[in-house]
């Protein structure tokens, strides 16, 4: 997908969202019913395999090329004391990723998947949303295009993750702006390790929402979002335009895509939500977008960890779909 020249192009793309192949989906459902098992007995694994058939336009979907994209950014709102860790940890963790020492490195190695780390202007945090917009239109466009550029059109699957001290505060602010309700219901601890920090986050978000009042989806992303959130938005949009399925990680990734959902409620139909984070707002956000997570493992790490674990569920679905024999091929009697 080519980079955007202006934000208004997004509205044109939303009107042209490609859809899964319904004919293939129907054939895939019938194919599943011919495999040597009671119909529906593999549960969500069957749904996943049919999902991939529809998006890949084939009865034999594959995952030969998987991209795991981790976007990193820093946030001006950290100046408000919403975190227990200094912002320098973002750069330090990016270095840890590059040196192979993080959880996501081990999960990618275990799954034989290449990991791409994409830091975005870490020495220049976004503006503090407590006082005004995080970004202007030019900055937002640059970051969205970074996400778009990261998606390889030959990929079979995109796994998304993030790193950024302060971005759970950003995710809560975006979610509240998108769907409303009590701020406290959207705010979890993140890396805040005491009640005072949690209260501080709620107070900061309340003020930030009053200062940044615009509720049009792209304005929400621009005024309240971070650079990594904008890049995730861009990568998600690019994947949709290329009909590439996506596995989303936790709360921050989901919140990054929420403005896209508001633009068109079907815009995330190519996305699998890998898990439900322990972050308080994630369960509510998934419900607001009518999405069901594959896993619930009490994970709240970020960095794509939950999504990468979910990848193994997806792979299990496809190996069963592609490898199982049919009743007819092995002479086993089917149900009547």
Language-model-detected regions and their locations in the chain:
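N-terminal loops that bind phosphate or other acidic moieties
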Residues: 2-336
